[in-house]
Structures are given as C-alpha cells and as structure tokens.
Design a protein with these regions (language model features):
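A charge-rich, low-complexity, intrinsically flexible signal that marks solvent-exposed coils, linkers
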Residues: 1-87
Length: 87
C-alpha cells in the first residue's frame, strides 16, 4: 500500500466524522473523486431521467473521465482536509 493509498483510506474514514456536513456541491465532488480514485473512469449506463440524485452523481463522476486514479485520490485527500479533516 502506497503512502497515497494510506492517505486516501484515512480521508475516507475522516469524511464520516466531519463536524459540519459538506454542502451538496462538495458532497458530489467527494463522491466523484472517491469513485474515480477507487474505480477509475465511469462505467455502466447513466441512471434514468427521473433519478435526479443518481444522474447528478453519474454526471459528477463522468466529468472526471480521464483523470488518473492517483490524481483523483490526491484531490479527494485535499478536499477532505479543506473541509476540516484532521488526519
């Protein structure tokens, strides 16, 4: 496990204990960076038109298409720190 993998794992745990809930924009960004960092480019069909939450998540992840998993992990770690993470 690399140093970045350890930081990414720590950030995932830390995000669950943030004292203030991130706003919707930051939540979508966290979701997209997590998915890109753990799975890579978006896979599977886009959710249906009336699945607003699923569509928003899919589109946020889709915007990161082509971003390396390592870069997404680093951005995730930095965002969690910005939101008050202390790991």
């Amino acid at each position: 496990m690399t140093d970045l993998d350890k930081k990414f794992a720590a950030a995932q745990a830390e995000v669950k204990t943030l004292t203030k809930r991130p706003d919707n924009e930051d939540m979508l960004r966290l979701y997209a960076l997590y998915k890109q960092g753990s799975e890579g480019d978006v896979k599977g069909p886009k959710p249906g038109f009336f699945d607003f939450v699923g569509s928003a998540k899919y589109e946020a992840w889709e915007k990161l298409q082509g971003t390396s998993q390592e870069d997404a992990q680093q951005q995730y770690v930095e965002l969690v720190k910005k939101l008050g993470g202390s790991f």
